[in-house]
Swiss-Prot record:
GO terms for molecular function: oxidoreductase activity, acting on NAD(P)H, quinone or similar compound as acceptor. It is a multi-pass membrane protein. NQR complex catalyzes the reduction of ubiquinone-1 to ubiquinol by two successive reactions, coupled with the transport of Na(+) ions from the cytoplasm to the periplasm. NqrA to NqrE are probably involved in the second step, the conversion of ubisemiquinone to ubiquinol. It catalyses: a ubiquinone + n Na(+)(in) + NADH + H(+) = a ubiquinol + n Na(+)(out) + NAD(+). The chain crosses the membrane at residues 11-31, 35-55, 77-97, 110-130, 140-160, 176-196. GO terms for cellular component: Gram-negative-bacterium-type cell wall; plasma membrane. Keywords: Cell inner membrane, Cell membrane, Ion transport, Membrane, NAD, Sodium, Sodium transport, Translocase, Transmembrane, Transmembrane helix, Transport, Ubiquinone. Pfam families: Rnf-Nqr. GO terms for biological process: respiratory electron transport chain; sodium ion transport. Its EC number is 7.2.1.1. It comes from Haemophilus influenzae (strain ATCC 51907 / DSM 11121 / KW20 / Rd). This is Na(+)-translocating NADH-quinone reductase subunit E.
Amino acid sequence: MEHYISLFVKAVFIENMALSFFLGMCTFLAVSKKVSPAFGLGIAVTFVLGIAVPVNQLIYANVLKENALIEGVDLSFLNFITFIGVIAGLVQILEMVLDKFMPSLYNALGIFLPLIAVNCAIFGGVSFMVQRDYNFPESIVYGFGSGLGWMLAIVALAGLTEKMKYADIPAGLKGLGITFISVGLMALGFMSFSGIQL
């Protein structure tokens, strides 16, 4: 159990997808203007990562990995296309569910919802799972931990952005300038977690 807690904390804080690896920055920067849509996108990314990583682990371990199906057959060259297909399918399901049951969030996310399918944080989570050779329970913990870490980062940035509306920011730094500085400072803050040994 301690191993899974350690993996979860590592995925959320120490190896945060947005602030340690800078993955998923397109949607991260674009949707971080208000807390409500940022939180909704964070939930969506957590959902997709939490399901895509374990599902792709099962597919990789039982079908694509060398000697998984038949002795001597290695289908790992199909990794990328298979992983992308699973991620795209999950995003389509998520898009239909949000359109049906949460139309306000669906409209607030706009074009960024289908862009989750090509969000490199999702693909990065799946790729790290393969690279680190996580088993199924580890992939569940890692997927949800990575998603929650990304959500924590985008909600924190959205909160900062909302507060900065009332600040006297120099004209040259308004918009993305101050956002990049804020993300850099947040990344430095999260870097302090790297010294934690679990």
